[in-house]
Amino acid sequence: MTCTVTVLPAGRKLSAQPGENLLTLLRSANLAPEAPCGGNGKCGKCTVLIGGKPVLACGYTVSGDVTVHVTAAKTHARILTDGYGAEVELQPLRDGAMAAFDIGTTTVVCYLLEAGTGHLLAAASAVNPQQSYGADVISRIQRALAGEMEAQTRLIREQMGSLLGDACRQAGVLPETVGVISVVGNPCMQQLFLGIMPENLAKIPFAPVLTKAEVGEAGDIFPCCPHAALVTVPDISGYVGADTVGCVLASGLDREEKRTLLVDIGTNGEMVLGNRERMIVCATAAGPALEGAKIRFGMRGEPG
């Protein structure tokens, strides 16, 4: 027997087997509410309405035809696009505009840059759609190991393609003329983007897989950019990623004579102390202090 789950206000009808978990079903259709704890019943924030009553989607088992009202997960984000940085001489691999992605655990950003000069042409950002698999990297690793990696990979690639399209429209640039696409993120976000199972990040010694810069073809992941090169920046360790490498290069810390402290406050937070001779790096979870993932009352800095 197959059950029909009607999802409002999307107006979608989903087929489910008796005993199927509602949150898992909604995830498969990209209709899931936010689930900061990854669907473990700890945060109480994947609430949906069934028969006018609030129910946690992660704890509801489909047993028959049902109508579910789902509040859409947040998709928009505001980002800072201006700031101070070091002058970096650019040597593009290929002609055409350049796109740079920062895959954050919470926010994903696409910058479109002019080749040669690095002048910012446009920027687009959105909330990472993997949020329904958990607000933190540990939750997403657990869901990937439970068989939901391909779904997370599909979600992030689709969103990055959409953001690239938005940035190109803003700048009046044809996507097929983009020559280089560069991607940074913490190790988990990079591996999920590339479709690499993050099991290495779930066990000691948490060794990174991406230990050197890689250059490949972007067309398989971004069909709209068939001629672009895809550049992935290396990770430093299991929980210090390519985004930190990007911070070091953009700030010029790798060329500083005096000791300098660099702090990246995100869902995954990093600190770098040093100069061009030596750097010491550490990471910690900053998200719980800012986003309320696993506390009873709390949320991101957003409307609500």
Question: How should each PLM-predicted stretch be described?
Answer:
Residues 32-64:
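Local cysteine-cluster metal-coordination motifs and their immediate loop/turn environment
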Residues 39-42, 61, 101-107, 113-116, ...:
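A short acidic Gly-Thr/Ser loop motif
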Residues 52-101, 108, 179:
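Fe-S ferredoxin-like electron-transfer domains
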Residues 80-96, 230-260:
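Conserved phosphate-binding catalytic cores of ATP/NTP-utilizing and phosphoryl-transfer enzymes
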Residues 98-102, 178-182, 260-264:
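Short glycine-aspartate micro-motif
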Residues 110, 118-136, 199-213, 255-304:
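Glycine-rich phosphate-binding loop of actin/hexokinase-like ATP-binding domains
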Residues 129-170, 294-298:
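N-terminal phosphate-binding loop and adjacent alpha-helix
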Residues 136, 178, 192-246, 290-293:
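Glycine-rich phosphate-binding loop and adjoining helix at the ATP-binding site
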